[in-house]
Swiss-Prot record:
Residues noted as binding L-aspartate in the record, renumbered to the chain: 176, 222, 452, 497
Protein localization: Cytoplasm
Domain of life, source organism: Bacteria
UniProt: ATP binding residues: 222-224, 490, 542-545
Principal location class: cytoplasm
The name this protein goes by in its record: Aspartate--tRNA(Asp/Asn) ligase
Family of this protein: Belongs to the class-II aminoacyl-tRNA synthetase family. Type 1 subfamily.
Subunit composition and interactions: Homodimer.
Keywords, comma-separated and alphabetical: Aminoacyl-tRNA synthetase, ATP-binding, Cytoplasm, Ligase, Nucleotide-binding, Protein biosynthesis
Site (Important for tRNA non-discrimination): 33
GO CC terms, sorted: cytoplasm
Length: 602
């Protein structure tokens, strides 16, 4: 007989009755019934009930003193449970093991929180004792699910002709839009490596190297603040790059992967392929967001022209100054109490708006509300037609400069979807957002900057760049840039790449970079492009966000084995931490006085 186990704790069935077995695991629960002691023994696979009887009083007494989460090995005989004690919620619920002997492999101290329930525990304690937290069923299953998803992704990608690569972790800084994690070089004092924000340049260089289809389950490092769907330090993505492809080729390659994943690991309805494509400008108009949740049926409409010549002075004057008006329908909300509309106004104000106009259209078509008296009957009918409003609906209005009005309307749309319970249930709705602006105005400097990935190919190529003379014309340029969105969550960005040096130099010069700066920052890739680069493109769906959706987790930390907390700390391993002066000297690093003071305190 094996030293620790002959079976796992999810394995024994009626067919095993009268078999002598050995099991090992953690004490999940213990129940003392006087002449009987029951222990639920748990391992990675499941739970088996162990019974100790008064036929062996010492063994039963020893079992009654076992602490929860102690690790034990039990030898005994499988017996059938009586009809009234069968537990149909367990795969092993028709049997139990009558213990003959047990040994304690490792006794547990007093637990900082309860393991055998999903009851919330303080997050700090959970992170400090993550090894205990990971024993809890839901979190344990999430980590298993993550492994299964990644394994299936590898299978799908390999079956589609992709080759898996590993790219460097120690590399140079790149302009991915976030702060780098820097690693000082001992051999080159004063110089630093950067942990990759993404393997962007390496995967493009692999295409230039003659490989055709690349993928990697890639670790990415960005010094960002934590969010519910974003880790503050490290995340993983399905990094993909392909040679000789158009935007549509990327779509037709990734869509089956997403569809297969989401249909395999959930019973919910999944968008059929091909996924709907929505141009960026249309998405901002209809949904007030570049990551729309298509489970929400509300579609925003532009009603600027209706208010341009209206008697509603506030909107009319705003329009004269360049503002717009967006209408956000609220289906079947006309009869709701005044408190609902007041709550929506409070929400808009909390989002920075001056207020939120609205109109209610009764079931008979009567219009009422603070805006009604400023509109003619013809304007009201035009409003209903333009915004697809029916009798019984209400409609809210957002007026501001184009970008602000669109974003406010989008937030109101989301809030209405929640308040009115409009979201379609039990489904995953995918879409592509395409034709992103190539440039944007930097809010801090007021200068032209790249909107997304600077390595994207501008639509129209170098001709489009050279023909755009004014700031307005530059801001109208679009890129072969695309996002894939599911239920309002951006799963990935991707692009057809700029593989021509002359276009890259021109694109960067418009954003204020000289050729020398481009060569300095991206010399390796520029050099490669001068020796025959294929047209190529790619995408990088976020593994963590995919797992979050499939696990129905509300926080990214619930699908990562050892995450950082919101302050980017690892409370289990005590990272980040101060290091000895000797190590700093080897790296030619000197702490600032304030940092030195903090180090001395520790």
């Amino acid at each position: 007989m094996h030293k620790y186990r002959t079976h796992n704790c999810n394995e024994l069935q009626i067919s095993d009755v009268e078999t002598e077995v050995k099991l090992s695991g953690w004490v999940h629960r213990r129940r003392d019934h006087g002449n009987l002691v029951f222990i639920d023994l748990r391992d990675h696979y499941g739970i088996t009930q162990i019974v100790f009887t008064d036929q062996n009083p010492q063994l039963m007494e020893d079992a009654s003193r076992l602490r929860y989460e102690s690790v034990i090995t039990v030898r005994g005989t499988v017996v059938a449970r009586s009809e009234d004690t069968i537990n149909n919620t367990l795969p092993t619920g028709h049997v139990e093991v009558l213990a003959v002997e047990f040994s304690v492999e490792s006794a547990a101290d007093t637990l900082p929180f309860v393991i055998n329930t999903e009851k919330d525990a303080p997050e700090e304690s959970r992170f400090k004792h993550r090894f205990l937290d990971l024993r809890r069923e839901k979190l344990h299953n999430n980590i298993i699910l993550r492994s299964q998803i990644i394994s299936h992704i590898r299978h799908l990608m390999t079956a589609s002709g992709f080759t898996e690569f590993q790219t460097p972790i120690l590399t140079a800084s790149s302009p991915e839009g976030a702060r780098d994690f820097l690693v000082p070089s001992r051999m080159h004092p004063g110089k630093f490596y950067a942990l990759p924000q993404a393997p962007q340049q390496f995967k493009q260089l692999l295409m230039v190297s003659g490989f055709d289809r690349y993928f990697q389950i890639a670790p990415c490092f960005r010094d960002e603040d934590a969010r519910a769907d974003r880790s503050p330090g490290e995340f993983y993505q399905l990094d993909v790059e392909m040679s000789f492809v158009t935007q549509e080729d990327v779509f037709s390659t990734i869509e089956p992967v997403m569809y297969d994943l989401f249909t395999k690991f959930t019973d919910k309805k999944v968008s059929e392929t091909p996924f709907v494509c929505i141009p960026y400008n249309e998405s901002m108009l209809k949904y007030g967001s570049d990551k729309p949740d298509l489970r929400n049926p509300i579609i925003i409409a532009d009603v600027t022209e209706i208010f341009r010549d209206s008697d509603f002075t506030i909107f009319r004057e705003n329009i004269k100054k360049g503002s717009i008006v967006r209408a956000i329908p609220a289906p079947k909300a006309a009869a709701l109490p005044r408190s609902f509309f007041d709550k929506m106004i409070e929400f808009a104000v909390s989002e920075g708006a001056g207020g939120l106009g609205y109109i209610q259209f009764s079931e008979t078509g009567e219009a009422k509300g603070p805006v009604v008296k400023f509109l003619s009957p013809q304007q009201l009918e035009s409003l209903k037609a333009t915004a697809s409003i029916s009798n019984g609906d209400a409609v809210f209005f957002a007026s501001d400069k184009k970008e602000k009005a669109a974003k406010l309307a989008g937030k109101v749309r989301i809030r209405l979807g929640e308040e009115l319970d409009l979201l379609e249930k039990d489904c995953f709705k995918f879409c592509w957002i395409t034709d992103f602006p190539f440039y944007e105005l930097n809010e801090e400097t007021g200068k032209i900057d790249f909107s997304h990935n600077p390595f994207s190919m501008p639509q129209g190529g170098i001709d489009a760049l050279e023909q755009a003379k004014t700031t307005e014309e530059l801001l109208e340029l679009t890129a072969y840039q695309y996002d894939i969105v599911c239920n309002g969550i951006e799963l990935s960005s991707g692009a057809i790449r700029n593989h021509k040096p002359e276009i890259m130099y021109k694109a960067f010069s418009i954003a204020g970079y000289s050729e020398e700066e481009v060569d300095k920052r991206f010399g390796g890739m520029i050099r490669a492009f001068k020796f025959g680069a294929p047209p190529h493109g790619g995408i990088a769906p976020g593994i963590d966000r995919i797992v979050m959706l499939l696990a129905e987790a509300t926080n990214i930390r619930e699908i990562i084995a050892f995450p950082l907390n919101q302050q980017a700390e690892d409370l289990l391993m005590n990272a980040p931490s101060y290091v000895e002066d000797k190590a700093l000297k080897e790296l030619s690093i000197m702490l600032s006085p304030s940092a030195r003071k903090n180090a001395e305190k520790e």
